[in-house]
């Protein structure tokens, strides 16, 4: 706050710091065999424009910037160009790794990135470089936290907790629950907080009760890694990544959602969250993102009617489920493909000899495939901890 004094009256001016929350870019992610990098570039350009037109001071990126541990050179180029433009000449970017990112690889360029106002946390033990002549920059840092200040003297405290998988928590006591381990990690990131500024947590977690989409691995769905919203008591705002559907727990614990629609059940519009703080209070504004193709899920019982329906969704990616009494012919398949070049998934369900539906196994999730295989070999369902172990191994190989 600034106090302007004149000869006749006092004028109190409140300065507002604007903070943009985004996550789950998944740069390099494809849909089936379709390249989506041009869509991702367009959506990132849209975020840059929001930063410029809405006077954003600080950008928070809550993990999963890449889709794999070893992103392509093209994906890395898109990432670095985007965050450099978001930082511009006067903004700062604070970014953490997610479960799809290699935290060590992501943070390798942290010293150079900090010179551009970009602060990369690959683990909860990282410490950011401080100082610089930029208008918005790090003024203090320690293990797992950074304080960002601007030229007006306003500051915001960010407790940064990248995706805490079991490998990253292996030094913690094994008898503790996952939630208790996280509580201690969060407490470590509070070491530099003494009040007097907005108090934020930036993390990549699965909150109990969250709505999951098909584009996310179901590794957290057994509940072992679901954390209660009460874990975040005491923070003014919690900027989360991991779940692709925008959602919130109260007003100040939010998932911004993914950059694009990455699965056919993600029908909610994509967005970023813009925070406005005067140093004592925070308000939230949801700003829609319009870049990227729609993902549409359709069903029909007749191939010709399905072709007519497909023509209505030109420019979208489509998953079509056909429920037929007889197998689909090759000519019908060609007709459907010609009706919409965005048809990326064609699921045909026909009646079996006994009138039962025949479901293609390619429609099953990793968890369902594992359970089906286990039942076929051992004649019983696998234990939940065995399923979790399998999915953890699958994640490590991804």
PLM feature segments, named:
Residues 58, 276-398:
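Accessory, non-catalytic peripheral segments of nucleic-acid enzymes
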Residues 74-87, 110-121, 213-226, 251-269:
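Short, electropositive alpha-helical surface patch
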Residues 6-90, 201, 392-398:
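N-terminal active-site segment of His-dependent metallophosphoesterases
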Residues 88, 194-195, 230-234, 310-313, ...:
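Short, conserved loop/helix-junction motifs that constitute active-site signature segments
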Residues 199-201, 229-278:
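Contiguous mid-protein beta-loop-alpha structural module that forms a pocket-lining wall or clamp
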Residues 24, 44, 59, 64, ...:
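Divalent metal-coordination and catalytic microenvironments
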Residues 71, 94, 101-239, 243-247:
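His/Asp/Glu-rich metal-coordinating catalytic cores
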Residues 131-154, 253-317:
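Binuclear metal-dependent phosphoesterase catalytic core
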């Amino acid at each position: 706050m600034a106090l302007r004094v004149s000869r006749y009256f006092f004028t109190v001016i409140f300065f507002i710091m604007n903070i943009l929350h985004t996550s789950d870019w998944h740069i390099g992610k494809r849909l089936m065999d379709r390249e989506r990098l041009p869509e991702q570039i367009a959506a990132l350009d849209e975020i840059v424009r929001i930063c410029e037109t809405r006077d954003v001071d600080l950008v928070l990126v809550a993990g999963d910037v890449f889709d794999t541990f070893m992103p392509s050179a093209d994906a890395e180029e898109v990432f670095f160009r985007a965050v450099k433009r978001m930082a511009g000449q006067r903004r700062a970017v604070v970014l953490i790794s997610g479960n799809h990112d290699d935290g060590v690889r992501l943070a390798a360029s942290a010293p150079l990135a900090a010179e551009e106002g970009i602060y990369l946390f690959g683990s909860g033990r990282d410490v950011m470089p401080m100082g610089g002549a930029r208008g918005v920059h790090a003024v203090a840092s320690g293990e797992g936290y950074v304080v960002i200040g601007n030229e007006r003297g306003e500051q915001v405290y960010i407790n940064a907790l990248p995706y805490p998988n079991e490998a990253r928590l292996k030094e913690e006591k094994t008898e503790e629950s996952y939630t208790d381990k996280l509580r201690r990690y969060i407490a470590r990131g509070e070491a530099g907080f003494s009040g007097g500024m907005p108090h934020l947590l930036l993390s990549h977690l699965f909150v109990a009760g969250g709505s999951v989409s098909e584009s996310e691995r179901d590794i957290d769905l057994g509940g072992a890694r679901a954390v209660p919203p009460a874990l975040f008591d005491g923070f003014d705002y919690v900027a989360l990544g991991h779940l692709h559907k925008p959602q919130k727990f109260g007003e100040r614990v939010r998932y911004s959602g993914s950059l694009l629609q990455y699965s056919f059940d993600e029908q909610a519009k994509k967005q970023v969250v813009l925070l406005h703080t005067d140093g004592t209070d925070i308000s939230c504004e949801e700003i829609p993102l319009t870049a990227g193709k729609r993902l549409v899920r359709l069903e029909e019982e007749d191939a010709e009617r399905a072709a007519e329906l497909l023509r209505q969704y030109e420019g979208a990616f489509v998953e079509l489920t056909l429920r037929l009494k007889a197998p689909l012919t090759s000519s019908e398949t060609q007709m459907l493909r010609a009706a919409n070049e965005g048809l990326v998934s064609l699921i045909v369900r026909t009646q079996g000899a006994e009138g039962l539906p025949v479901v293609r196994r390619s429609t099953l999730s990793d968890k369902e495939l594992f359970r089906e295989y286990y039942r076929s070999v051992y004649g019983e369902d696998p234990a939940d901890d065995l399923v979790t172990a399998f999915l953890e191994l699958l994640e490590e190989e991804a």
